[in-house]
Each structure stands twice: as structure tokens, then as C-alpha cells.
């Protein structure tokens, strides 16, 4: 079945109290609308049209970073969901198939649920509405059903007391033949409490014309929409619990999992150990058998099998750790490759650097990669030993099996097998410590009132 998707993303989100368009607020490092698009693309639709409104340019710029193959149309004046869908007409006028209407601020409806809707649509059904049962329906629209057929949807503001007692609620998601959709939209009016064009009004119109209308029922948590900061916080919690559970089910060990925060795209292998208070930013892959110790922050990095990171380490974008690498406490690595068996165990900054195999980077080593204008690269070879407190002023190359003495400042290449000593010669001034201390104390005494 040919399928088109319309994503409604025009809402101002007034209750978010934010300059940022509502659909661009993030869960686990990705905008709400990106979660929706990641799900619906599993349906392999022939066309995706996103209806924007408030902050249209921002939404378009952000979405195209994730999903370049979508079409945008702007709802210039917000006149309701029916009007928003109608804005997509020009982009779907020649489409023959089913159109699925979803919402950019409802991120938790699963691919399986959407697939169930399409499967129901294929069973000689003209329209399918996604619904859910709720013990506290509040402001949700109610579904009026008779003998298994959906008759109409009544918005809570327009419902009478009997209708408000109905537990079967509208999720907002509708799948309908494309031609029928726009034919029905021509007939809806704004004669309601909000003076808006409701998409839901097409249900009663379709029923009056003897079209077949069915419902698919999902679990209420799937339909969670984000309208306030509090709901956004709750959605983050829901997502984190879901992805933590998935990581454990796939063979990872999470210590105090409630303190571990994943990104939407984090990939965790089997037998990975993750300690408490670890934060994953976007773009992190951890291979099987790796260990992430407590209080680490990781983003845009790849950690290979058997490697260990932390505690208190930070891996920034562009970092690649090969097998059996050790990154220890208070180490920051950015845009660097650390090859198999190498160690950076403590108190170091490694930036724009490649480190060969089985090298040891001493405590306090700093790669001076930035001259105030440009970044420069450093190359450290295999089986290199850098003494503690070594500074490498990039660009510089350290050859295989070479060494630096403690406290060395490296400003030129070190050939293979050489020892570099780049510090001033120590001079001991006999008895000068006592003289200096007396001088300092006398100066302090003169300054004191």
C-alpha cells in the first residue's frame, strides 16, 4: 500500500513558555519531531510532508539535519488541525494511496502501532483512527462507536455530560484514503467552541456517507503529548526508563540505572559495564566488554571491545578508542584516535591527536593543539612513553619507541627511539630557602596594618 505521512508541527506551544518551537524541544538529545520521524520512516512512506507554523525556519533547518528527504509547508494562520492538514493538499494532490496523519509533539507511538493502523486500513477500511482507553480522559476528544463502527469524535469542550463519561479517547492519529481526506476537508466547518476547523470532524462526515471507519486501540502512555515543561520532563523520564530496560535486556550491566542517561541513538553492546552517574550525548557506540566507570560524560565517540573509561573522564566528538584502551580519571579526549592497548590514565588532555599501539601517556600530559586561531594535530607513535607533565605543542610527531622526560615541553618532532628532555637544568642555591622565607615574611609584615 502506498503511504504518505503528514506531520503536524505548527503549534506555538504557548504553555512551554519558550522561544524555541515546541517540536524542537529535546528528549534524550533529539528534538521531539525527530523521534516521530525516526519512527514513521520504518513504514517506508512514499512521501513525508511536515506542516510548520511558529518558528517554521528553525524547524525546517533542524529537521533537514536529521531527515533531508521531507517536504515542508507552512500554516500561516493557525485555524485548527483540519486547516493544518489542508495546507498539505498541494503536495499530495496527485498521490494515490493512504495518508497517515501524525503529530510532531507525540514521540512515543511505536512503529508497531503505526503498522497496526496501516494493516487495519488495508482490510477494506476507508478510515482508521488510533484510540486509547483512559480512566482520566480530561480534555481528550471522545470516540462515539456503534456496532464496531466509529460514528464521530466529539471534542471535550463540545461534549455533553454523557459523552464526557466515555473512556475511549482520540489520539489524533488518523489514516484515510488520500482523495477521501481532502474531499472531506472541503466540507468541514468551524462551528464549534474554538471556531477552528477540527480534523476530527471528517469522521462524522465519512460515516454519513457510509464509509467504513475502524479504530485501533493502543496503550495510553504511547499517546503522551508534550505541551508543558513538566510533560517534557516526564517524557524524558519515560524515554530513559525505556532505553535503560532495553540495554539491560540486551546484555549490559547498569549500576544504579536511574543515574545513567542515554541519548536517543546510543548503541551499547553485550557485556558492557556502566557505572553510576554516566551521561551519554549523541553519537556514542560502546562495543561488547567495555567498561564505563562512574561520572563519565561521553559524546560523539566510539569505544571498542575491552576498553575502559573513567572514572571522571570526558570523551568528546571524534574520539575513537581501539580495543583494550584505558582512559582514566580526569582525562579529556577530543577528536583523537587512541590505538589498541594504549593508556591515558590520569589528569590529561588529548586533542586532535592520534596515538599508536601500546603507548603510555603519563599523568598531566597536555596536547597544546590550539594557537588561538587554528587547531593543529599531534601524532604519537607505537610503544611511546611520555613522562608525567609533558606538554606537546602541536603540530608535532613523536616517533615509535620514543620517550619524554618528566616535565618536558615538546616543540619539535622526536625521532624513533629517542629520549626528549625539554626543561631547564635544575640549579640548587645553597641556604637560599631560609633567606627567601625571611625576605617574604618581612615584606608581609610591612604590608600588615
Tell me what each language-model feature is.
Residues 8-9, 51, 102-103, 129-133, ...:
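Short beta-strand segments
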Residues 31-102, 108-113, 439-442:
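Conserved N-terminal catalytic core of the sugar/cofactor nucleotidyltransferase
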Residues 45, 96, 124-127, 211:
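Short, high-confidence coil segments that cap the C-terminus of an alpha-helix
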Residues 169-267:
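Conserved alpha/beta core of the MobA/IspD/sugar-nucleotide pyrophosphorylase nucleotidyltransferase superfamily
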Residues 253-421, 426-427:
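Structural signal for interior beta-strand "rungs" in well-ordered beta-sheet cores
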Residues 57, 109-193:
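Conserved core of the sugar-phosphate nucleotidyltransferase
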Residues 20-26, 188-191:
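Short glycine-enriched, charge-decorated loop/helix-capping segments at active-site entrances
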